[in-house]
């Protein structure tokens, strides 16, 4: 049986923690930030941990990063 391929789009957008959780950058910070509140800009910096339902989908795309 051939090896499963990792989705290139997933490996660029997500990373795994040592405990198996999935980290991602929050959406909504590419452009149009001039009209956003300072609180919104502050909240979307850094990374966030995905919910269990979303993490399950992402882990299918990254079979060797568990």
Swiss-Prot record:
Protein name: Large ribosomal subunit protein bL35
Record's compositionally biased regions (Basic residues): 1-14
GO cellular component: cytosolic large ribosomal subunit
Entry keyword annotation includes Cell wall biogenesis/degradation: no
Biological processes, Gene Ontology terms: translation
Annotated spans, Disordered: 1-34
Organism: Paracoccus denitrificans (strain Pd 1222)
Lineage of the species this protein comes from: Bacteria, Pseudomonadati, Pseudomonadota, Alphaproteobacteria, Rhodobacterales
Gene (UniProt): rpmI
Keywords: Ribonucleoprotein, Ribosomal protein
Record family assignment: Belongs to the bacterial ribosomal protein bL35 family.
Record-linked InterPro entries: Ribosomal_bL35, Ribosomal_bL35-like, Ribosomal_bL35_CS, Ribosomal_bL35_sf
Keyword Heme applies: no
Pfam families the UniProt entry points to: Ribosomal_L35p
